[in-house]
């Protein structure tokens, strides 16, 4: 079964707004170490893909390449038949750190970098993540989970077609993490954007994604479709079996030293507004 057909079981049955991605021979080298090794990957429009692997395997490096925060040493990154760089305005990125500006109120963080009459749109984005009533508060008054909801609203206001998630839930408690997973999944089903989620949490990957990709020492070691109906029952035997399959592969790999994060080509404020 090809990757496109494998996605159909979980991808929302509606007109896809997401960006289709194609990576062709993508590699990234830091000095003598090749972190990514000729990655070939096709992601259909509107698919939810989770990327897992041990620390240092290259998964966050891959996400930075897709976000345009770094450049490949070789290979092509495509959005459909065009260069992915041409779709930057349709791409948004969330980090583990919410990166809210503490001197700006919640609604102003959501509208960061926008011009014109954006406040109604920002309030709508906050309403979508359940925080409309906190619009005029300061970030310091919010919990960690609420700050990540604001970061998600900041991405949603741009109506992204590609949402890149770099372990955005890693610092949250277990219950808040599940609530955020359900929120992200619900918004994905509603809006149809393409999602790539980097996570250390295998159970999270299997619970929310159409497809789980394991990076092993810079290469795709496993590309596993998750063909389960939504919403998924976290206690199901099938979900547990898929989780065990991926986890056993992850644990069989050694942990590698982390890669240095390259200097972003984007101004700091624009990175935070991603």
UniProtKB/Swiss-Prot annotation:
SUPFAM superfamilies from the UniProt entry: P-loop containing nucleoside triphosphate hydrolases
Any one GO MF annotation of this record: ATP binding
Report the EC number(s), separated by commas if there are several.
7.6.2.14
Q: Name one Pfam family in it.
A: ABC_tran
Catalytic reaction(s) noted: ATP + H2O + aliphatic sulfonate-[sulfonate-binding protein]Side 1 = ADP + phosphate + aliphatic sulfonateSide 2 + [sulfonate-binding protein]Side 1
Localization per Swiss-Prot or TrEMBL: Cell inner membrane
* Lineage: superkingdom: Bacteria
Q: Where is the ABC transporter domain?
A: 21-242
What is the top EC class of this enzyme, as a single word? translocase
| InterPro entries membership | AAA+_ATPase (IPR003593), ABC_transporter-like_ATP-bd (IPR003439), ABC_transporter-like_CS (IPR017871), ABC_transporter_ATP-bind (IPR050166), P-loop_NTPase (IPR027417)
Q: Cite the record's note on assembly.
A: The complex is composed of two ATP-binding proteins (SsuB), two transmembrane proteins (SsuC) and a solute-binding protein (SsuA).
Purpose of the protein: Part of the ABC transporter complex SsuABC involved in aliphatic sulfonates import. Responsible for energy coupling to the transport system.
Q: Identify this protein by name.
A: Aliphatic sulfonates import ATP-binding protein SsuB 1
Source organism of this protein record: Pseudomonas aeruginosa (strain ATCC 15692 / DSM 22644 / CIP 104116 / JCM 14847 / LMG 12228 / 1C / PRS 101 / PAO1)
**Corresponding gene?**
ssuB1
